[in-house]
């Protein structure tokens, strides 16, 4: 079976790829992350993934839409519930790409993060699968998160400190500084 793996970053993807390949899936990576800002962050994550994909012979499809304006427009009406829009942006596009590319299924490296809302992501991915009539391959990759971070450090990957959106970055700094917005 061939599956399209939506990839948020190389540190999260490395163990997902290993697990899927270990389960005999033919994996193709898919880069689409209009939520990642600023542009320097977007570029750092994308370039790290490109280099890693080349070293492990991972086919990689890139949709390089730096989407600051569409992303902010989509989430600005309800900042507190922005994650659902972010998941929809990426998982619906992954499902569409999987269907159009003739893949048997799709999944995402987002499912490795203990910091993401797993049930919400799963629900969004299932809706995307139904809309595009393609299988959503669910895997709970969270048990591999620490090993993936270790491997990323060993390989010298760029490792980010926030999910990618500017609101997440703001939260990270506000927690450290104890400043109230």
Q: Over which residues does each language-model region extend?
A:
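Nucleotide-activated chemistry modules centered on ATP-dependent adenylation/adenylyltransferase
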Residues: 1-181
